[in-house]
Structures are given as C-alpha cells and as structure tokens.
Amino acid sequence: GVRFNWDTDVDQLKWHADGITVTSSTNGEQVTERFDAFVVCAGVGSRRLASMLGDRVNIYPVKGYSITVPLGDAASQSSAPWVSLLDDDAKIVTSRLGQARFRVAGTAEFNGFNRDIRADRVKPLVDWTRNLFPEVDTSACVPWAGLRPMNPNMMPKVGAGRRPGVYYNTGHGHLGWTLSGATAAMVAEQMRGDRVVTAMPRPRLSFS
C-alpha cells in the first residue's frame, strides 16, 4: 500500500549502509523513520535534499508566468482555440481548459525562489491574447507565477544517486506533466532491478 503525508516538511535526511532515515515535521510534530530506498522528486527543493544525501544536483528555480482567462460569454468561448498553440517568436503557449477557461503561459525569469507576480511580465500575455483573439474578454484574467525546476543542460535528473538506495526523478522544467510519469516508471523499474538508467549521450559538435 501507500501512505500520503500531507503538509509535511522534510527536516533532515541521513544515509546509512542499511537505509535512509527521514526526519519530518507535520503540524509541529517531528518524527524520524527509516526506509530502504528514497526517491527525490521535490521540484525546486530537490537541490537541498540531494545535498543531505551526498549528491550535487544543480536544479534551480526558473519562474514562469501564466494567465487564466475566464470564458464567461458565448463570443469568448467560440473564439478561444481548442487546440494548444505555441508561438515560437513570442515564447508563449496556450491550453484550453474545458468550456470556460483558456490559459496563456510564457516567459522565464531567474529570481531565486521569489513568486511575486510582476505586472510587466503579465501584460505581454494579456496583450498577445487581445491581439490574436480580440473577441475573447480578458478583463477578468487571473495571473499566476510558478517555479520550474531546471537543470543547466535542460535535462531532468533521473535514476540512481551516488549512494545505494538513493534515486532521483526531478528537474523536468516546464515539461513536468509531460515527462515525469514516464521517468517515474523508469525509476521504479531501476529500483526493482529491471532497468539500468543511463545518461543520454552528449551530441557531438562539429564546425566547418
């Protein structure tokens, strides 16, 4: 079976030859438990946890912005596209969320763990929507900002760590929902001994 610990902070991780001890706090109550194996899949918090386990994982937060546009009238609903769009020049992507919502996302910002929403980052998303879909009412947009866990090479950290029993499934950047399920299955197979996860070969660069 499985047990979910909601609203729990991981305070300390310690690797031992016979397993990993995890000290965590829930509602002010601290407990320490031992596990045979540990998978780090903590998004932008993965770097801190990895350092406790003897690994250097260079995952950093890259802030992205989105607006969710309520499609509250017939004109907006009929004008917003149902297929996802990618504007490569503007670096903007869209997703239709059912009948009544339209999401527009883009930008990348290096600003530590700050999640404040800047008006100058939101405005280009609103302007882009108004220019391309003038019939969509953008007066009630809901802005949002989130932190993408990114590696410098844009590749996720998947597979075993330096020490036995330590595994990683993190750093998927803006493709977390797209990739993390498949890489989780790969890590599970590796933990069972059914698969060896190896690094992707580096591309060869040639100049003429």
Predicted region positions:
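Beta-strand segments within the central parallel beta-sheet cores of soluble alpha/beta enzyme folds
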Residues: 7, 140-142, 200-204
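Active-site substrate-recognition segment that forms the wall
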Residues: 12-19, 24, 32-33, 37-162
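Hydrophobic/aromatic beta-strand patches that form the interior of the parallel beta-sheet core
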Residues: 5, 39, 167-169
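A conserved beta-strand/loop element that lines the FAD pocket in flavoprotein oxidoreductases
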Residues: 1-11
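Generic secondary-structure signature for well-ordered alpha-helical cores
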Residues: 2, 131-135, 192-196
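Short beta-strands and strand-loop turn motifs
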Residues: 7, 105-107, 169
